[in-house]
Amino acid sequence: MSQDMVTVLTKRILESVQYYENFSIPIGVSNRHIHVSREDLDILYGEGYALTHKSELGQPGQFAANETVTLQGPKGTFKHVRILGPVRKQSQVEISKTDSFRLGIKAPITLSGHLQGTPGITLIGPKGTVELSCGVIIAARHIH
């Protein structure tokens, strides 16, 4: 291989390395949170209540709301759990494995929206309480 060829290849390799050094993929870790249905939001916050935006999420159209609820499980409680908007068809609570031990709930690791056969929990808001019969999950790793 000639010296000119080595120089050209070296230059191309260095350009590729520099490109990927500046390349980034945003990664987020989601803390415990809840998605609520219209019906449950009406009970928790009052009839016709509209969630207020705290911050936008990476997923287009989704946001963290200023509103929070208390999660009450058989063994423990978490206060100030953030509601994510907009409202959904069915309420869903996403927690970590550690949270599940503290709450006393055997939540399965599954994809968001896969709620059949999942345990329930009590949601406490400023205007009322909702007893979910199902909907508590540990979200499986996923990419948005």
Across the structure, where does each feature detected by a protein language model lie?
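Short beta-strand-centered segments at strand-helix junctions
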Residues: 26-74, 79-126, 130-144
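Short, low-complexity, charged amphipathic interaction modules
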Residues: 1-21
